Amino acid sequence: MGVESVRCPLHFTKMQGAGNDFVVLDLRDGTPPPDAALVAWLADRHFGIGCDQVIAIEPPRGVGVVAAYRIWNADGSAAQQCGNGARCVAAWLVRDGSLADEHFLIDSPVQAHSVRCIGKDEYAVEMGLPVFEPERIPLSGFPNACAEYVLSLQGEVLRCGAVSMGNPHAVVEVDLIDVAPVERIGPLLQQHVAFPESVNVGFVQVIDPGLVRLRVYERGAGETLACGSGACAAAVVLMQRGRVGRDVRVVLPGGTLRVQWPVSGGPVTLSGPARCVFDGVWYG
């Protein structure tokens, strides 16, 4: 479904999870997914609808799954994982009346996610297993997993953690989150040779063992008000280092998320809000 071929009017729902906002399209009738140009047009905050990511809800792909979905960044590039988006898909399905249970499975581009409704506009999503092996993140130039990697960045030495939550993340611990060099370091790390598929860059400040503050510079979107997979990435990297406990609140500019990782080798659970903002019609 391209800009020229899109069937107008196009019905959509605007949703947000902790300020991370989405344009959600219902394509369960078999309508082709949008191409990169249409995604970028829809995501444009001046000439389109405006969002961090576009989500298409599609028919289920597996047994026991209620629906599948795809995600695109604001620049039109495909995304593999999005924790806030998964919760918004769940909230959309609940609002649509498509569910008979408060515990269900939805299919992302990388895996099936178990979702539970835990309160009004609150959902818990099982995000799967964190991956620390460099070749699977992917992270080049390091044969073995480390708690901290040392990179050269335009003459500076940068220390970061790295993990995949279905998409690659670098995690930089800082002393003061409000003055973290997000707009400078974020793009440089995304272009670094160590990250051949680019990377989402999280800047995290530990407040206490149960509370951290986080800002994320996302692939294809820049800094966003919240990033669910980024919250999981920051939390598990800090847990591996012993900096925080196994149940931590992550405060982002758009709201607070909860990340639980009870045991290494087990799945990570992300909990937080997901809300419908409005329904609309796009006329192109």
UniProtKB/Swiss-Prot annotation:
<dbReference type="InterPro" id="IPR018510">
    <property type="entry name" value="DAP_epimerase_AS"/>
</dbReference>
<feature type="active site" description="Proton acceptor">
    <location>
        <position position="227"/>
    </location>
</feature>
<comment type="pathway">
    <text>Amino-acid biosynthesis; L-lysine biosynthesis via DAP pathway; DL-2,6-diaminopimelate from LL-2,6-diaminopimelate: step 1/1.</text>
</comment>
<feature type="active site" description="Proton donor">
    <location>
        <position position="82"/>
    </location>
</feature>
<dbReference type="GO" id="GO:0009089">
    <property type="term" value="P:lysine biosynthetic process via diaminopimelate"/>
</dbReference>
<keyword id="KW-0457">Lysine biosynthesis</keyword>
<dbReference type="InterPro" id="IPR001653">
    <property type="entry name" value="DAP_epimerase_DapF"/>
</dbReference>
<keyword id="KW-0413">Isomerase</keyword>
<comment type="subunit">
    <text>Homodimer.</text>
</comment>
<comment type="function">
    <text>Catalyzes the stereoinversion of LL-2,6-diaminopimelate (L,L-DAP) to meso-diaminopimelate (meso-DAP), a precursor of L-lysine and an essential component of the bacterial peptidoglycan.</text>
</comment>
<feature type="binding site">
    <location>
        <position position="53"/>
    </location>
    <ligand>
        <name>substrate</name>
    </ligand>
</feature>
<dbReference type="GO" id="GO:0005829">
    <property type="term" value="C:cytosol"/>
</dbReference>
<comment type="similarity">
    <text>Belongs to the diaminopimelate epimerase family.</text>
</comment>
<feature type="site" description="Important for dimerization">
    <location>
        <position position="278"/>
    </location>
</feature>
<feature type="binding site">
    <location>
        <position position="167"/>
    </location>
    <ligand>
        <name>substrate</name>
    </ligand>
</feature>
<feature type="binding site">
    <location>
        <begin position="83"/>
        <end position="84"/>
    </location>
    <ligand>
        <name>substrate</name>
    </ligand>
</feature>
<dbReference type="Pfam" id="PF01678">
    <property type="entry name" value="DAP_epimerase"/>
</dbReference>
<keyword id="KW-0963">Cytoplasm</keyword>
<feature type="binding site">
    <location>
        <position position="200"/>
    </location>
    <ligand>
        <name>substrate</name>
    </ligand>
</feature>
<feature type="binding site">
    <location>
        <position position="73"/>
    </location>
    <ligand>
        <name>substrate</name>
    </ligand>
</feature>
<feature type="binding site">
    <location>
        <position position="20"/>
    </location>
    <ligand>
        <name>substrate</name>
    </ligand>
</feature>
<dbReference type="GO" id="GO:0008837">
    <property type="term" value="F:diaminopimelate epimerase activity"/>
</dbReference>
<feature type="site" description="Could be important to modulate the pK values of the two catalytic cysteine residues">
    <location>
        <position position="169"/>
    </location>
</feature>
<feature type="site" description="Could be important to modulate the pK values of the two catalytic cysteine residues">
    <location>
        <position position="218"/>
    </location>
</feature>
<protein>
    <recommendedName>
        <fullName>Diaminopimelate epimerase</fullName>
        <ecNumber>5.1.1.7</ecNumber>
    </recommendedName>
</protein>
<feature type="binding site">
    <location>
        <begin position="218"/>
        <end position="219"/>
    </location>
    <ligand>
        <name>substrate</name>
    </ligand>
</feature>
<feature type="binding site">
    <location>
        <begin position="228"/>
        <end position="229"/>
    </location>
    <ligand>
        <name>substrate</name>
    </ligand>
</feature>
<keyword id="KW-0028">Amino-acid biosynthesis</keyword>
